[in-house]
Amino acid sequence: MYMARMLSEMSTVKRPDGCYIVDQEHYQIVSGYAGELLPSNSNVCNCGISVALQKLENKSHNGMDCIIYTSSFPDCSHCLEKILNLKISKIWHWNSPTTTKELKILEMLEASSIQCEKYTPTRTISINFNN
């Protein structure tokens, strides 16, 4: 999730987000951030998920059973369609779905056997310089 958050910092668009896709062994396959690629079609979103999925399609990897780490929940039909077609197995997202549209997308993903979980940090590092 750290990489997805750092990728979102590279974003130059109004709604920054980053996406990091790994295989089942957690090896990086592709990454992307919003605004990285210019869309060839104005009807296609240019979010980090879309950019990473576009890169995944251009590789020889089929995307099956991959895991997506994203700084924002996928909220567009274009990304949803790509996620379903590539048979992604799990999505870790930083922000929880809050809108009605996002909740419907969450239901569709879970109905398609795609696990969706909000990422919660499990470890914190604190350094005390006063000793």
Curated annotation (Swiss-Prot):
SUPFAM superfamilies recorded: Cytidine deaminase-like (SSF53927)
Pfam families in the cross-refs: dCMP_cyt_deam_1
Gene3D superfamilies, alphabetized: Cytidine Deaminase, domain 2 (3.40.140.10)
GO function term, MF aspect, one: catalytic activity
Coiled-coil blocks: none
Domain CMP/dCMP-type deaminase, residue spans: 1-116
InterPro entries in alphabetical order: CMP_dCMP_dom, Cytidine_deaminase-like
Annotated protein name in UniProt: Uncharacterized protein F10E9.7
Species of origin: Caenorhabditis elegans
